Amino acid sequence: MQDSIINDKIAHAYIFTGPRGTGKTSTAKIFARALNCLNPQNGISCGECENCKNFNQSPDIIELDAASNNSVDDIRNIVDSVNIAPTNSKYKIYIIDEVHMLSTSAFNALLKTLEEPPEYVIFILATTEAHKIPITILSRCQRYDFKHISVDVIKDRLKELADIEHMEVEDKALRFIAKTADGSLRDALSLLDQCEAFSIGEALTYDKTLDILGAVDTDVFSNMLRAVISENTVECMKLLEEMISYGRDLSQFVVDFTWYLRNMLLLKTSDDADEIIDMSSERLEALK
């Protein structure tokens, strides 16, 4: 995208697709800012010109959340405004989030504009479910796929923010938060804020992080494993019913139980399991 700005090879429609929390909408805004920057540096906005400073208030940047504005009338309003030239920018940019939520009629209304857009109009569509978008729309967009962010990258970013905020956080706690976020930096930041709120004035330890985030006690997993090994169906059902009564999401319980089994395998096969297993010292000893 930087190269397209440098070489002035700008498409009229882009689609950013990938899992939630991976930066699609944020990237769309960063890209839009760079497109209308008066003095871009290597394809990146300068942050100093009038267009950069007034980006959030610019009438030439139009955002639409298709999750709640998905009717044909919503899109027709956009189509009607397309013919009005930008006020003080090079491009008039439409950012449509969760675009897969648009109705069939809304997609049809959008299609004609995508086929013959004015030179100054750019559409940036963001979605978590590209397969739900009509091929007629996809074929007219330059596509970028966003992937889950690695645990290490998320952890490093959390560490940077913790240092800026002068938070004392154990490295293992940050790694657990990063893993729990499941590739979503946005979710990781939310979890870190949650942990910070419950540990004001105290160091955020790994054990405290487990308590705050409500990690299931390993005794439950241990009892479940014993019941499975002994083929005790009654005990398995009893444990599952207890999880339901506590309001536990069983699909998440399965994920956590799988992680527990992974930790057990690591204990049996790795000499440095203590460093890579996401478990408190007390629980780790119990697992051994």
Identify the meaning behind each predicted range.
Residues 50, 57, 77, 90, ...:
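Extended, largely alpha-helical regulatory/partner-binding modules appended to the mid-to-C-terminal parts
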